[in-house]
């Protein structure tokens, strides 16, 4: 990304394409599992809500001077399967409308978070302790964490929900 505006534009573009896929899914089918896809529509959204919520929490906690535990206080990086199940248990019981609204709110908050940061804070290494602590060997700038929790999964999970729709609708 050349700057924060390009990052924000890619997040918006990816999110709008991703979230639109859910408009044609009836509420009654939100928990239907198909063999071809690893997540139901509700689980698909719960995963996105979970990661975007954590991303916002990492930044907010550091700003408040709270020690950040990545990926969360409850789980370590070698427990991602359990974390994903926690996302499902925590969020997927909500309606599709509620899930979409919650994710939209998180994406809006991430855009605001980006606006509040300087280009240096976003694109230079070692600008956030939580970003440094989250990776043992690699050096990740904050924008990479934003990308892998927004733009990247919005693309891959859009493919998954399209596959689910093809098998179900």
Language-model-derived ranges and their functions:
Residues 1-17:
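Extreme N-terminal tail/first-helix region
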Residues 1-4, 41-58, 96-106:
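Charged, low-complexity, helix/coiled-coil-prone segments
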Residues 2-7, 89, 93-100, 143-147:
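Active-site rim elements
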Residues 15-26, 52-56, 60, 104-118, ...:
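Structural signal for well-ordered, non-membrane alpha-helices
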Residues 23-30, 34, 122:
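Short, flexible helix-adjacent loops and helix caps
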Residues 31-82, 125-169:
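Short, contiguous alpha-helical
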């Amino acid at each position: 990304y050349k700057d924060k505006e390009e990052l924000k534009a890619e997040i918006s573009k990816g999110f709008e394409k991703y979230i639109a896929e859910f408009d044609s899914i009836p509420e009654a089918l939100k928990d239907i599992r198909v063999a071809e896809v690893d997540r139901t529509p509700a689980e698909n959204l719960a995963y996105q809500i979970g990661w975007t919520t954590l991303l916002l929490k990492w930044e907010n906690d550091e700003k408040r001077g709270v020690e950040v535990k990545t990926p969360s206080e409850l789980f370590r990086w070698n427990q991602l399967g359990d974390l994903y199940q926690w996302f499902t248990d925590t969020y997927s019981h909500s309606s599709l409308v509620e899930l979409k609204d919650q994710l939209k709110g998180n994406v809006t908050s991430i855009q605001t978070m980006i606006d509040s940061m300087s280009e240096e804070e976003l694109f230079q290494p070692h600008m956030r302790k939580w970003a440094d602590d989250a990776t043992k060997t690699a050096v990740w700038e904050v924008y990479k964490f934003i990308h892998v929790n927004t733009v990247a999964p919005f693309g891959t999970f859009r493919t998954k929900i399209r596959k689910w729709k093809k098998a179900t609708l």
